Amino acid sequence: MKKNIFFVVASTLLLFSTTSIFAQLWDFSSEGKLDPKNMLIMNNAIQTDAGKAVNHMYNFKFDEAEREYRWFKYKYPTHPMPYFLLGLNEWWKIVPNTDNPMYDDRCLAYMDSTILYAERLYDDSDNKVEASFFLSAAYAFKGRLYSERKKWVKAASAGKSALKYLEKCRSYTDLSPELQFGDGLYNYYVEWIPKEYPMLKPILWLFPDGNKEKGIKDLEKVANNAFYTRMEARYFLLQIYGMEKQNEKAYQLAKYMHDNFPDNPYFHRYYARNAFLNGRGLEAEAEAKSILARIDHHMVGYEGVSGRYAAYILAYINQNYYRNFEVAKMYYNQTIGFAIATNAKQSGYHISSLMGLGKIAQTEGQLDEAISFYKQVADIADKKMPQRDEAKKAIEEVKKLKKQQKKGK
């Protein structure tokens, strides 16, 4: 799993804001103007339409979601909500492969429009809470995207703006579940980032301290008790459980997300991965094959990153459980192909696939070929990766075997 360096400072706010918006849809008068006295969650028509559209989006039915969002834009052309939803739609197109900049411009343009109309709403309304929701959300998404592109100064600036408007939302006490959600994300990641990336400590001086353990507990409360933010809390807990090596919890969540959004490739690959990590081999095998089939059929969002996960799972299972080395080699080579296509030569799946091919070659007595694979691992793998030392030891072991073979002749 790719660990985005600035990811949380932005995403903390991002998810608080996005789900808060859906929870706090406003009542409009017959003239289409916002009535600041009616900050409601009781507008069932808007709530239902937005909820259906968001579910389409999470299930990667982007055209269906966009139709609903554009209807909101037609009905409320000067309100930030439709522009934010359209930007959110573009963001989820980015999620399966965050290295792909194809949708960046559209996503940023919609977030800029959100900020424009939210600032006008903020200036024109006595009640600042709604506008602050959208300002916090839009800035958070911009910060998150800038962090993916390693534009750290822009990411920090956007994150700080998002924090500023998040604080303005706290005046509305009925938002406590959403605030706890945002606080939980913030507490976890603000402590996690400097431990994983010490070079970012100077940037994090701009932000309040966090508490990782409290953050997890807050998110679990939201995931179990909240209504509007429940799914988003589970989405982030899925990643957190993985980072904290809580594999059974990660598996249960991943399965739940995939069951609810079966065409979402991000949730699908997490489900396959966590089934694999938890020893559910048949389940992992079935889902990995399904992912590769969907890639072959060009289903929306299914591409090389998900393929990397799936092909590696199938390679490992065939090598270590079925002892079918020919099939294992095919899938390892497929994993390598996906890694190269997605500029991920230093990914764990690519490195481990080279190691797998080396071990198979060694088992089959192809010692020169085995050394070649191990050398690739030693050259490519980061110093912190255990495969690097493993490959170096394997090279020495194979060299000894070659010497023994020569002596025996």
Predicted regions span which residues?
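Residue-level detector of the short coil/turn that links helix A to helix B
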Residues: 60, 143, 150, 210, ...
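TPR alpha-solenoid repeat register
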Residues: 82, 131, 179, 233, ...
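Bacterial Sec-dependent N-terminal signal peptides
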Residues: 1-33, 37-40
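Residue at a conserved register position within TPR or TPR-like alpha-solenoid repeats
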Residues: 56, 90, 139, 146, ...
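Alpha-helical linker/edge segments of TPR/alpha-solenoid repeat scaffolds
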Residues: 92-103, 190-198, 246-249, 280-286, ...
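Amphipathic alpha-helical segments of tetratricopeptide repeats
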Residues: 74, 115-116, 163-167, 217, ...
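Short coil turns that delineate tetratricopeptide repeat
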Residues: 77, 126, 173-175, 227-228, ...
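Short coil/linker segments at helix-helix boundaries
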Residues: 31-37, 42-48, 56-67, 78, ...
